[in-house]
């Protein structure tokens, strides 16, 4: 049984809240990719209670990224739920110290699997 920490950001006011999802709701997230939108009703989350303000019921969560159990970040350009070492020059998982620097880094693919611990999502109205 998978359990995820989901960080939900509200772009209208800049507030982010972290919730924990487990059980059937977590099973619905497995197999989704970065960029996919999931209706909040499908997950059984009451966002109005979490954010303390009125959120429309037809709101969706757009998956923006996440990290696995060992802290490796998800990258949208690596397909599948696998972990892989790739040569990076910029983007999620790498901050160059010098201009033009490239380095091999371990990152996680763009698909949610049971090894993922944290999922970053943004509200879409």
Curated annotation (Swiss-Prot):
Keywords: Ribonucleoprotein, Ribosomal protein. GO terms for cellular component: ribonucleoprotein complex; ribosome. It comes from the Archaea. GO terms for molecular function: structural constituent of ribosome. One of its GO terms (biological process) is translation. HAMAP family: Ribosomal_eS6. Belongs to the eukaryotic ribosomal protein eS6 family. This is Small ribosomal subunit protein eS6. It comes from Thermococcus gammatolerans (strain DSM 15229 / JCM 11827 / EJ3). The lineage of its organism: Archaea, Methanobacteriati, Methanobacteriota, Thermococci, Thermococcales. The gene is rps6e.
